[in-house]
Amino acid sequence: MKFQLSAILIIILFFLKSGSLLSQQIYLSPEGNDSNPGTMYQPLATMPAARDRARILRSENSQQPVEIIALEGEYLMLKPLELDHSDAGTAVSPTIFRAADGAKVIFRGGVEINGFEKVNDNLWKAFVPQVAYYDSYFEQLYVNGRRATRARSPNDGFYPVRKAEETIAEKGTGRMPQVAVQKIIVDSSDIKDITGFTDQDHEDALVIFYHNWDNTRKRILSLSKSEPAFFIAGEGMKPWNPINSKSRWFIENFQGALDAPGEWFLDRTGYLYYIPLPGETIENTIFHAPILKEFIKISGVSPGQTVSNIRFENLTFTVAGYRTPSTGNEPAQAAAPVGAVITLDYASDISFTGCEIAHTGTYGLWFRRGCNNCSVSKCYLHDLGAGGIKIGETTLRNAVNEITNNIIADNNIITDGGHIFPCAVGIIIFHASDNRLTHNEISNLRYSGISAGWIWGYAHSPSKRNIVRFNHIHHLGWGELCDMGGVYTLGASEGTIVSDNLIHDVYSYDYGGWGLYTDEGSYGIVMENNLVYNCKNSGFHQHYGKENIIRNNIFAFNIRAQLQATRVEEHRSISFTNNIIYFDKGTLLTSNWHKFNLLSDYNCYWDTRTKEVRFADNSFIEWQKSGKDTHSVIADPMFTDPGNFNFNIKNLKVAKKINFKPFDYTQAGVYGSDEWKKLGATGRDIEVEFESVVDRNESRTKK
C-alpha cells in the first residue's frame, strides 16, 4: 500500500512539474480575439489579455499550473507584457508562457511598412503617416530580417578628431563638470557634409564619438565660423577618458548622408527613404519599424513580495527600438544605464528557455534589483542594440536581500551586438553574487565578452562567488574601442572562478585587447584551465589587484605581448603557476610584469622564433636569479597542430615537470543538437572580415 501511494505521489508531482495534463490552459492565436474565453477553439489574441485571464483562473484555483499556449504565427505587440506580484505562481503551480508544441511563435514589437515607390532606380520612398501625425519617429529599421544602416558619413569607418576643447558652464561638485560645451576640431574635408545643416538637421543628426572604452552620442549645437569645428554640449568630459586627438567620430541621420546601398533616412514629415541593395525589389523587400522599446516588464514590490515561478519557453521576441534623448547619451562604461527589452525587479524562480531575442535597440535581458534563482538557458540573442544579459544593479544597496543573486545563464548564443551602444557587454554582472555563466557562445561584439564586478578599487563589493566556466568568447573589439577583455573583472571578488573558457580573437583599436583582464581592484579570483589566443595586446593583463590565482592556462599567439601588468603595489598581486605560454610574435612580457609583486613558477615558455626567451631585459637565467620561475622551463610543449589552433599537448614530460593538467577546451561553448551548435558557430565570412580588420590595423601600425 505504501508503495502504491508513493507511486501515485510521484506521478502527481511529475504532472505538476511538467505543467501539462493537470494545467489550466489559455490559448493565443494571431487570428484570436481578446473577447474570446481563451480556449483552443476560441483563443485570445494578445499576451496582456492572456495574463488577465490567468489572474482570474488563479483566483479560482491556485493549485494548478496555468499555461498560456501561443499557437503558430506572428503576433504584433502594441504594448509590453507587464507582470506583477499578482501573477506569481508557486513551485508546483507555475505560470508558463510557451509556444504550442512544434510551433514557431514570433512576438513582434514593430509594424510592417508598405507603400514604397521608386523615386528612381536607386532610391525608394514611402509615406509613414504615424510619423507625420502621431510623433512615432523611429531610429531603427529592419529590412528582410537585417538591421539597415541609418544614413551616415563616412559610410564606413570613422573621421579623426584633431582636438577637443571644453568650456565649463557649471562645475558642480562631482568628479566631472556638471554642464559644459565642447568644441570638436576636425579636418575641413570631414565637415563639408554638415556645413549646410538646417535647424531640423541639428535637432535630428547624431554625432557618435569612440574614445577608449566609451561612446558619446550628441547633437551638434552649431558650427565654428573660424575653423573646421563644431560644438556639442551636456555634462563635462570625464578627466579619465575625454574626447581627444585619439578619438574618432561619425555622423548619422541627415539626408545628405543618404548615398550608399542599404542606407535609409526618415524625415519629420513622414517620408522614409531607402537605397536598395543589389537584388532587392519593392516586391521582395519587407520593412519593419519598431513601435516598442521593450517586450516584458516583471516588477515585484519588495524582497518579500516578488514575482515568482513564471516560465517562458520557445518564444521569439523581435523588433524593438531605441529613441535617443534630445540631449544625446553621455559616455558610460558597458552601456550600464541602457535598459533591456526584458527587465526583472524583485523576481525569483523566473526562467527563459529556448527563446529568441533579436533586432533590439537595447540589451536583451536585465535581472536588475532583488532577483534570485532565475535562469536563461538555450536562448538565442542576436542583432542587439547593446549587449546580451545584465545581472544586478549599478547602485550599491545596503540590504543584502536587495542584491540580485543566483542567476544562471547557460547554453546561450549571444552575438552581433553593440549596434547602437558599441561599448555594451555580452553578459555583465554588476552588484550581484553567486551567479553562474556557463557554456555560452559570445561573439561579434565591439567590447568585452563577459564582465563581473562594479567597484573600482579595494572597497567592499557584493560581487562574489561568480562562476564563469566553459564559455566560448571570440571575435571581439573589431578595432573600434579599447580597454576590453574576453573576461573582464573589477573589485573584490572572493570566490569568483573563471575556468575552462575558450577565448580568442580580441582586437582593440589602440591599447587594451586582452583575453583575461583583471582590472582595478580585482581580488580573490581564480583563473584556470582557460585557452587564450590571438588577442591584440596580451593574453592576460592585470591593471591592479591582489591575491589572484592564474594557473594551468594556455596563452598562445597573442600579437603584441603574452603577459602584461600595469600598477606595481606592495602586496602580492598574483600567483602565476602551471601555465603554458607559446608565441611566435611580439614579446613575452610588457609594461610592468617584471616589476610587480607576483609568485611565478612551474610555467612553460616557448618562443617559436628562438630558444632565447627574454623576460623584459633579462635572460631566463637572470630572471630566475630574481626569484621568479625557478622551476619553470623553456621548452616546446609540442602542441598537436598549433597552426590550426589544436593545443592538445604531446610533450607530457614538460606537462609533468610544471604540473600542468591537460583540459578539454573543446567543451567550451554551447551544447546540445548539431543544429544548435551550428547556429552558434561563427561563419567564415565573419572570420575573414575580422582578419582583414586585424591585418589592416597591424599594417598601419608597422608604417
Question: What spans do the regions from the language model cover?
Answer:
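Bacterial Sec-dependent N-terminal signal peptides
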Residues: 1-24
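The right-handed parallel beta-helix/beta-solenoid scaffold, focusing on the short coil/turn
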Residues: 24, 64-66, 73, 79, ...
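Extracellular polysaccharide-degrading/modifying enzymes targeting complex plant/algal/animal polysaccharides
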Residues: 25-351, 356, 397-401, 626-628, ...
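Extracellular beta-strand solenoid repeats
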Residues: 69, 76, 82, 96-98, ...
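Short glycine/acidic-rich loop motifs that flank beta-strands on beta-rich extracellular proteins
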Residues: 79-80, 321-327, 361-367, 385-391, ...
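Predominantly extracellular beta-rich ligand-binding scaffolds that present long acidic/polar faces
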Residues: 79-86, 92, 96, 524-646
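Beta-propeller domains
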Residues: 236-243, 252, 280-300, 305, ...
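Right-handed parallel beta-helix
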Residues: 308-319, 348-359, 371-386, 399-418, ...
